[in-house]
């Protein structure tokens, strides 16, 4: 079937039958992801004018790479499958675009050549591509993970094996998954004396997506490692805290209710977005994008999120406290009136971030 996104029209496998067992995988749900990718590429080229080359490392139908080529990037589309590379060539020709199509193992290509921007968007975990992607990237590495159950702690052992961290299935599980992914990528880059800093990240529709800007040198890589640490969380009263470092030192019990705490990590505790870059990406969202309104709304929320490592869900808190929920704007305003920083988050309509702890939140928002 044919699909139009942005400035291009491509042929993709029939859906919904296509999946991991199909010859060429295409996910229509990821149109928002691809729209934001195009906007991010436009914004990054303005941020770093010397960049020009882009690798779609796991191309499949090639829709992401074709869209990059339509935005004047010197694009390489890579896939190990014959049907996929044939489809990539067909889709480039259909749109009268020039790009290089490579039938290759993505890891082999990324170990042998380097690109200004590398995009790794596989089915499932990106970790099998992580080392090669770091070595094959000059400036910006874009990564998608769709294995949200391991990332978020729902499939605990798989998460530990894949990401080298202890994930926990908390009420902020989407953010947990994002920060576990970032931790794994930051640690991978640091092994090569590279600082990989997220300038845009979001957890949307059962996937996590991040854009990591590279800086080279042992010192800056060490600075990134310093932003890893652990979150300690109480499942009973929802209290949580975090500390930095690669050695966990959790409190013995919850300081509020004295119940047992769960510890997750090492995860990324630093910023997941650069607000200035997020704003620049939003300005590059254009009307021909099918998810333009949704993308702008998401980016506006991301840009306004305060910098704390976890978020809360008002409905879950109020249920624990035995009181009714209220309008989010009113709830957040109460926190601000009490002197705390607070913002909505993109993780859900009833989620928020604040520098208040769970006891302070309850007191500040009481009637």
Curated annotation (Swiss-Prot):
Q: Which GO terms describe its molecular function?
A: tRNA (guanine(26)-N2)-dimethyltransferase activity; tRNA binding
Which keywords fit this entry according to its UniProt record? Answer: Metal-binding, Methyltransferase, RNA-binding, S-adenosyl-L-methionine, Transferase, tRNA processing, tRNA-binding, Zinc
The UniProt entry's GO biological process terms, in alphabetical order, are:
tRNA N2-guanine methylation
Stretches that traverse the bilayer:
none
Show the InterPro entries listed in the entry: SAM-dependent_MTases_sf, Trm1, TRM1_arc_bac, tRNA_met_Trm1_C
EC class name: transferase
Q: Which family does it belong to?
A: Belongs to the class I-like SAM-binding methyltransferase superfamily. Trm1 family.
The protein depicted here goes by the name: tRNA (guanine(26)-N(2))-dimethyltransferase
Residues binding S-adenosyl-L-methionine are 34, 64, 79, 105-106
Q: What does this protein do?
A: Dimethylates a single guanine residue at position 26 of a number of tRNAs using S-adenosyl-L-methionine as donor of the methyl groups.
What EC number is given for this enzyme? Answer: 2.1.1.216
Which segments constitute the Trm1 methyltransferase domain? Answer: 1-365
Quick one: which gene encodes this?
Answer: trm1
Residue numbers binding Zn(2+) = 234, 237, 254, 257
Taxonomically, the superkingdom here is Archaea
Instruction: One Pfam family, please name it.
Output: TRM
User: Which reaction(s) are listed as its catalytic activity?
Assistant: guanosine(26) in tRNA + 2 S-adenosyl-L-methionine = N(2)-dimethylguanosine(26) in tRNA + 2 S-adenosyl-L-homocysteine + 2 H(+)
């Amino acid at each position: 079937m044919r699909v139009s996104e942005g400035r291009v029209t491509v042929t993709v496998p029939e859906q919904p039958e296509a999946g991991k067992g199909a010859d060429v995988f295409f996910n229509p749900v990821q149109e928002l992801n691809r729209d934001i990718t195009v906007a991010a590429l436009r914004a990054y080229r303005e941020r770093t004018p010397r960049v020009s080359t882009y690798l779609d490392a796991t191309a499949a139908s090639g829709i992401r790479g074709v869209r990059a080529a339509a935005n004047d990037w010197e694009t390489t589309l890579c896939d190990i499958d014959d049907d996929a590379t044939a489809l990539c060539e067909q889709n480039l020709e259909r749109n009268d675009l020039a790009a290089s199509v490579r039938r290759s193992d993505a890891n082999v290509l990324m170990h042998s050549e380097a690109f200004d921007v590398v995009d790794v968007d596989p089915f499932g975990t990106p970790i099998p591509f992580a080392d090669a992607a770091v070595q094959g990237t000059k400036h910006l590495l874009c990564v998608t993970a769709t294995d949200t159950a391991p990332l978020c702690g729902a499939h605990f052992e798989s998460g530990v094996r894949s990401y080298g961290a202890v994930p926990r299935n908390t009420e902020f599980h989407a953010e947990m998954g994002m920060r576990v992914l970032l931790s794994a990528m930051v640690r991978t880059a640091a092994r090569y004396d590279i600082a990989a800093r997220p300038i845009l990240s979001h957890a949307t529709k059962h996937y996590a997506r991040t854009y990591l800007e590279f800086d080279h040198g042992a010192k800056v890589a060490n600075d990134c490692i310093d932003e890893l640490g652990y979150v300690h969380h109480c499942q009973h009263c929802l209290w949580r805290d975090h500390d930095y470092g690669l050695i966990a030192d959790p409190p013995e019990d919850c300081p509020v209710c004295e119940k047992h705490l769960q510890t997750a990590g090492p995860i990324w505790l630093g910023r997941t977005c650069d607000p200035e870059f997020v704003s620049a990406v939003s300005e590059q969202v254009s009307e021909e994008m099918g998810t333009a309104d949704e993308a702008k709304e998401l980016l506006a929320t991301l840009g306004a999120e305060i910098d704390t490592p976890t978020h809360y869900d008002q409905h879950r808190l109020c249920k624990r406290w035995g009181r009714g929920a209220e309008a989010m704007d009113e709830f957040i305003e109460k926190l601000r009136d009490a002197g705390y920083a607070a913002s909505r988050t993109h993780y859900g309509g009833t989620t928020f971030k604040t520098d208040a702890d769970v006891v302070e939140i309850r007191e500040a928002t009481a009637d």
